[in-house]
């Protein structure tokens, strides 16, 4: 597991109040991890803070799974 993947999974577990072991790449935030719309907004904000990035609304709407979040962080992270 890469450092970014581990950081993303830790943030998701903390934000959604689930065990980190439940946070696997194929899981969807809403369907599998019980997130609601406010949770997903807070999750995007936490990812922005952690990786020093800004996630536009149109991109945020596409981040619906753990793997989407990992891929986005890998692609857009600041050095």
Curated annotation (Swiss-Prot):
Single GO BP term: lipid A biosynthetic process
Any one cellular-component term (Gene Ontology): cytosol
UniProt main location, coarse: cytoplasm
One matching Pfam family: PP-binding
Pathway(s) the chain acts in: Lipid metabolism; fatty acid biosynthesis
SUPFAM superfamilies from the UniProt entry: ACP-like
GO MF term set: acyl binding; acyl carrier activity; phosphopantetheine binding
Modified how: 4'-phosphopantetheine is transferred from CoA to a specific serine of apo-ACP by AcpS. This modification is essential for activity because fatty acids are bound in thioester linkage to the sulfhydryl of the prosthetic group.
Residues bearing PTM O-(pantetheine 4'-phosphoryl)serine: 37
InterPro entries attached to this UniProt entry: ACP, ACP-like_sf, PKS_PP-bd, PP-bd_ACP, Ppantetheine_attach_site
SMART domains linked: PKS_PP (SM00823)
Domain of life: Bacteria
Localization, UniProt: Cytoplasm
Annotated keywords: Cytoplasm, Fatty acid biosynthesis, Fatty acid metabolism, Lipid biosynthesis, Lipid metabolism, Phosphopantetheine, Phosphoprotein
Statement: the UniProt record of this protein carries the keyword Cytoplasm: yes
Annotated Carrier domain residues: 2-77
Function summary: Carrier of the growing fatty acid chain in fatty acid biosynthesis.
PANTHER family: ACYL CARRIER PROTEIN, CARRIER DOMAIN-CONTAINING PROTEIN
Family: Belongs to the acyl carrier protein (ACP) family.
Protein name (database record): Acyl carrier protein
């Amino acid at each position: 597991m890469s450092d970014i993947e581990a950081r993303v999974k830790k943030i998701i577990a903390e934000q959604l109040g689930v065990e980190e072991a439940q946070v696997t790449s194929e899981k969807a935030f809403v369907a599998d991890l019980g997130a609601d719309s406010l949770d997903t907004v807070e999750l995007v904000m936490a990812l922005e803070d952690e990786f020093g990035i800004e996630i536009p609304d149109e991109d945020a709407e596409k981040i619906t799974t753990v793997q989407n979040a990992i891929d986005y962080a890998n692609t857009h992270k600041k050095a």
